[in-house]
């Protein structure tokens, strides 16, 4: 049974308090048709990343939240509400564990056996932790990545440069706008027409075509004129990329955001229509995967050839290199990952995808907080540019929300300012403050966030576990711990938190601790690995690290 879900707006409560109303509204917001990729099947984004295991579980979660007291905690096991325990008002109202498996059994094949038996759910990162805010949630990170590429190779701008990528799903859909915000041109290959239509509708993609020659003509004209342009091409990357190599057409930058982390549901083989692929996936998944692997090999071999001919290439965290490597492309890892290449220094400062959403549903609440963040950090010209661009270019999906990459000290200062705005009646209703799991200290993912760590600690998973426990101890409203987000089952462990700014003194105390400690652990994680930026940041903010100077 499916239905249309939208979070309530305004100040009338369905639950007993804002600390339980907030997770209920954000769960519902994850399944808003404006937000979710496939809401009828509870799929939010990222292949099969779900908000709840099934509709019965969804209904029970909502019912339980409506009756939950301020000293009780709901436990959610892979999208299923399993228990309520008496705790205390400082404890989280919800604790979530999604997709976690003992390491020896942590592979897609076994996961799918358990999923078919109704025992587990794939939560991705923010799908099962109820803090997905639509494509904007990844937009600034994508913008920052392409800005870093421009700064490193192209004198700080992508003007007159073009990017080749593939995948316009809920994550990859941020790429076209992120490139054009950096004044560049992008050709984005996508096999699913619905995804192209969605990006056009939300303003992330300028134009589309199903003809390669027409697409290239538009791209080349924009390059000559130095005008930003995003072009969607309805086609398969495993066909398009080798064809470009054959023609000697080499982009300036090449990356990829197909959902290759889940090859069965996230990647479509070449040489067949999208509908035929869906039928084959259902009728003969083994044959389907064989064709996927062959296509991925062609796809990555073409990118490697473009790299040899001068293109700046990087993997955008979907684990496609590993998939290609496992099927014969032994130089797949000559393609660098985007985190060590472009994001690690930001993580070392404690910067990452901090986000907030207006529970009122009133966009004015977000515009007022936009103004506040610029007042608090007037020295940050890059932040100012981002907020101004977001206000002009980003369309709301579901509850109005904003993302800004803020660092150690900044997150707590801003969170407390928001809480005061709620207290003083400047905002219509409370604000939820959270982040992506893809953050400075909350992930162990050797092919993405923790790839090529300075001390070789890529696969150490103690840090996200410490992050989750620290957020519980600090007073977050809900805390989650997941497996397999971004890069797929077997390749990552990660934690998330959300805290509600409801204007109370208790919220003030919780926000101060959570927003200091959560990001502080990220600084510690990078300082412990030997990154000078992180060491200096830890000292600047007086973070106690007993062995820092030993």
Curated annotation (Swiss-Prot):
Its main location: cytoplasm. Keywords: Cytoplasm, Histidine metabolism, Lyase, NAD. Coiled coil: none annotated. One of its GO terms (biological process) is L-histidine catabolic process to glutamate and formamide. One of its GO terms (cellular component) is cytoplasm. It is an enzyme of class 4 (lyase). Its EC number is 4.2.1.49. HAMAP family: HutU. This is Urocanate hydratase. The gene is hutU.
């Amino acid at each position: 049974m499916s239905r249309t879900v939208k979070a309530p707006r305004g100040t009338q409560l369905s639950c007993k308090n804002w600390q339980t109303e907030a997770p209920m509204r954000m769960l519902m917001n994850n399944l808003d048709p404006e937000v979710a990729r496939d809401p009828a099947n509870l799929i939010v984004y990222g292949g099969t990343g779900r908000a709840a295991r099934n509709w019965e579980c969804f209904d029970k979660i909502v019912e339980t939240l409506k009756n939950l007291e301020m000293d009780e905690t709901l436990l959610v096991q892979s999208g299923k509400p399993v228990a309520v325990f008496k705790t205390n008002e400082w404890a989280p109202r919800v604790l979530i564990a999604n997709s976690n498996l003992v390491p020896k059994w942590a592979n897609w094949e076994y996961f799918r056996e358990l999923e078919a038996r109704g025992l587990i759910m794939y939560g991705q990162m923010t799908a099962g932790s109820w803090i997905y805010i639509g494509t904007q949630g990844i937009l600034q990170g994508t913008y920052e990545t392409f800005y870093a590429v421009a700064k490193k190779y192209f004198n700080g701008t992508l003007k007159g440069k073009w990017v080749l990528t593939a995948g316009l799903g809920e994550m990859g859909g941020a790429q076209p706008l992120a490139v054009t915000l950096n004044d560049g041109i992008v050709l984005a290959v996508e096999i699913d027409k619905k995804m192209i239509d969605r990006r056009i509708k939300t303003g992330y993609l300028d134009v589309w075509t199903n003809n390669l020659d027409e697409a290239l003509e538009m791209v080349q004209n924009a390059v000559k004129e130095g005008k930003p342009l995003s072009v969607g091409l309805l086609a398969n990357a495993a066909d398009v990329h080798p064809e470009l190599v054959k023609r000697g057409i080499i982009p300036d930058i090449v990356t990829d955001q197909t959902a290759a982390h889940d090859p069965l549901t996230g990647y479509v083989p070449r040489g067949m229509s999208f509908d035929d692929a869906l039928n084959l996936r259902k009728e003969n998944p083994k044959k389907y995967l064989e064709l996927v692997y062959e296509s991925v090999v062609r796809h990555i071999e073409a990118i490697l050839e473009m790299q040899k001919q001068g293109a700046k290439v990087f993997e955008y965290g979907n684990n496609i290199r590993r998939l290609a490597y496992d099927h014969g492309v032994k130089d797949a890892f000559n393609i660098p990952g985007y985190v060590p290449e472009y994001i690690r220094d930001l993580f070392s400062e404690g910067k990452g995808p901090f986000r907030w959403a207006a529970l009122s549903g009133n966009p004015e609440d977000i515009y007022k907080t936009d103004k506040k963040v610029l007042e608090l950090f007037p020295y940050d010209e890059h932040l100012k540019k981002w907020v101004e661009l977001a206000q002009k270019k980003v369309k709301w999906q579901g509850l109005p929300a904003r993302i800004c990459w803020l660092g150690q000290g900044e997150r707590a200062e801003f969170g407390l300012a928001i809480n005061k705005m709620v207290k003083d009646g400047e905002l219509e209703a409370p604000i939820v403050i959270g982040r992506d799991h893809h953050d400075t200290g909350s992930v162990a993912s050797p092919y993405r966030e923790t790839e090529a760590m300075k001390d070789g600690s890529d696969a150490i998973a103690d840090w996200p576990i410490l992050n989750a426990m620290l957020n519980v101890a600090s007073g977050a409203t809900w805390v989650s711990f997941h497996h397999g987000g971004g890069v797929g089952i077997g390749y990552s462990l990660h934690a998330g938190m959300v805290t509600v700014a409801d204007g109370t003194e208790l919220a003030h105390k919780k926000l101060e601790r959570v927003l200091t400690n959560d990001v502080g652990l990220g600084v510690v994680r990078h300082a412990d690995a030997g990154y000078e930026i992180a060491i200096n940041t830890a000292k600047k903010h007086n973070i106690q690290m007993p062995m820092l100077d030993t």
